[in-house]
Amino acid sequence: MVMQHATKYVSVDAIPNKRAISIEWPENIIGEFEKNIYIGTNEKNMKPLICIDILLSENQANGALNFIVRSDAFESHYTYKVIDGNVSIDNVSTPLCINIGRSTLSLSEFLCKDRYFPTVRFVDGTTLQGQYMAEYRNEDVLFDREKIQVWDWVGVNIKNESQGNEKDNTSIQYCVIKKLKEQNFDIIFDDDNAGEIADVIAIKVDDVNKKVKVELFHLKFSQEDRPGARINDLYAVNGQAQKCVSWLHTKPEHILGRMLKRGASGPKNRYELGTQEQLSIIREKVKSLYEVEYIVNIV
């Protein structure tokens, strides 16, 4: 019975010919180590990892995975290949370097190291790290229809996802934040842009039961003017939601600490409700053994 849900690892000779839905940083640089990691076009133009995105390119080809590493200051394109069991990650445009502690090397070289292969997730639930494919022997579980909520989108431009610095009141994100403000949250945080865990993070503290609820909201704009059951939109937003799971395996105070750093940097005020001081207090409560519950929402 234990082996029924075991994970099987298979060495592959080439990139599998199936749809990839997300790419993630290696798990062992998330959390504790990320605060000491910087990426940039040169040693004088470095950004912390919390401000860097890694994502699949819209243009894919058989036998390779094209992906992008970007921040608000640069965008770099890479190609990930497996040829006869050997991994290559090559820069296509705008080469980047990575700084860890006192060590600096090219991002291509770093990502080809055994411990630092990116994680690629495929639509069938398998993952690829380096030349190893992980197959999870879990039974498919149907999503509970009762958990699907229907919202009123009148007045919202469903092709416009982000509210931006100007807080566009016709955007999907603005609408979501407005609805969350009607609920009993202590913190509502705009985490949008490169390096995000989610588009919106909402936090509620229960001091009586010593619990902290953290809700992550992943948003996806519609590719067309009218709503529809478009599988491409579903793949995209589910890929985003799966990426944040790696964060949920780190210590909760790492997520809150990361929010504090992002909230204190840049011109954008990310606190839609609550303050940096309140978030700092919540982080201390989490460190003092408050139980944390995570809920992932797709909008």
Report residues per predicted region.
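Catalytic-core elements of nucleic-acid end-processing and repair enzymes
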Residues: 147-195
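Hydrophobic beta-strand segments of well-ordered beta-sheets in folded domains
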Residues: 292-299
